[in-house]
Amino acid sequence: MSEKMIKVTQVRSVIGGTKKQKDTIKALGLGRPNHKVEIKDNACTRGQIRVVQHLVKVEEL
């Protein structure tokens, strides 16, 4: 059984953000606006997304 996946798109820049927000964006595999990644949907990932929810858009696949 395959795990659920989500597509995360960075919609805003991290300029002016805190170090925690910048590190979280990098950990998610993002780095610039309009960059997209597909990652596994689990509690760890959801926690990271919550930290930068104002910078990203999340879509269920």
Swiss-Prot record:
GO biological process, alphabetically ordered: translation
SUPFAM superfamilies: Ribosomal protein L30p/L7e
GO molecular function annotation: structural constituent of ribosome
This protein's UniProt keywords: Ribonucleoprotein, Ribosomal protein
Any GO CC annotation of this UniProt entry: cytosolic large ribosomal subunit
Subunit structure: Part of the 50S ribosomal subunit.
Family: Belongs to the universal ribosomal protein uL30 family.
Protein name, entry field: Large ribosomal subunit protein uL30
Lineage: Bacteria, Pseudomonadati, Chlorobiota, Chlorobiia, Chlorobiales
Gene symbol of the encoding locus: rpmD
